[in-house]
Amino acid sequence: MLLIHGLSSIAGTWWRIGPALAARGWDVSAVDQAGHGGRPVRGEVDAAGLAAAVLAVHPEAPDVLIGHSLGTVAAIGLLEREPGWAGAVILEEPPSRLAPELCLGMAESITADAVTVREDRAGLVARIRRDQPHWADEDVYWAVEGIAEMDPAPFARRLRVLAEEDSVGTPERIVAAEPTPYVLAASSERPLLDGGSALSRADRAELAHRLPAGHLLELDGGHCLHRDAPAAWLAAVAAVLS
């Protein structure tokens, strides 16, 4: 089983999930993506580039591939590069095509956080604790550490490109993937930049219509479901893989 983290995160985000899955009998690996955890960025940070970076450190095809947020982009890139590369695929909070102003806002946010974590780490810790009161201390630690170990520049550039690009929609790429992915989506009504879901209502409805029954699962929580609702996340994944 291979776990791929999201933007501004690192493999440590799976601190609870990885051991819990291992206790259920899975051989679990988690990778740091390009531009995260001290790894360099070579080329673009689009789906193809992210997939190539994953293969550089984990060339073995997994029985199960799980990605969160940016990790779902990498996962889709892996399946577009080699259909059927994984036995089963679970996408936690795959991001919809974002409005231009949201892309630009995220570019500014990740750049500002990279400065804040160097200049006022304690302040950033306090902000995340305030914004995410239900997170475990370890979740807060790894969230901050992920920001500290990220190179925001290539991702900010990519977000600015996406603000002007008319790319293929998320549902189209998910439905075309082989094997057909399972999607875990947050039920939160909050905006994405406030911790809400990255999957739009329109894309969610399209996926519900086009995916096989049982392939779209909604969980109570925000964008980081494996932090917000770890027990429900594990139960959903166990049900999918049983």
Which sequence ranges carry the predicted segments?
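Flexible "cap/lid" loop of the alpha/beta hydrolase fold
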Residues: E80, W85-E119
